[in-house]
Amino acid sequence: MLSYNIDIGGITALSIMTELATSHKTKIVIANYLEIVPTIANPNSLFMYMYDDIKQCIYINFSIPETLKIFSEAKNNARKALQNSDGLIIPGNVNMVDARLFGEVISPNDVKLHNLERNIAEMALIHVATQRGIPILGICGGIKFLILILVARSVITVKIIIYM
């Protein structure tokens, strides 16, 4: 299973697909993150912002039904996508990990550098793969995202993983 979007592409993902298919006769199944998490109409609605004099913080607002629905749907779709998979590859991509998922505030100028849908889809894929004992290969930005999901110890991260 390869997390990939044909419209966006990516040289790393393409080279992996070619190598595995030709040299190792491996069947590659592509998990398009847009099929796992449909485009979120208003991504900011998922987050609750709190400001005080010392620190501004942000967290995912799990009290609204839309948030729970998106995370639940992502997990169910990830289960289906990984149903007959022996491994999961998370390649790098041009987008940065959306820091809002980990309790950080991002600049309005940086919003376009993040892909919330892809981040949620890959979180769901990683969560399901680890539950099922499916090996995961992270490449470049994929390993960074994998480390954030599996190793980060913040309360926000733990809360997200519980809901996944």
From Swiss-Prot:
Q: What is the lineage of its organism?
A: Bacteria, Pseudomonadati, Pseudomonadota, Alphaproteobacteria, Rickettsiales
Question: Is Endoplasmic reticulum tagged as a keyword?
Answer: no
| Species, as recorded | Rickettsia prowazekii (strain Madrid E)
Can you give the residue ranges of the Glutamine amidotransferase type-1 domain?
A: 39-164
Q: What keywords is this UniProt entry annotated with?
A: Glutamine amidotransferase, Transferase
Please indicate if the UniProt record lists tRNA processing as a keyword: no
| Highest rank taxon of the organism | Bacteria
> What name is this protein filed under?
Putative glutamine amidotransferase-like protein RP713
Q: Name one GO molecular function term.
A: hydrolase activity
Matching entries from Pfam families are given as: Peptidase_C26
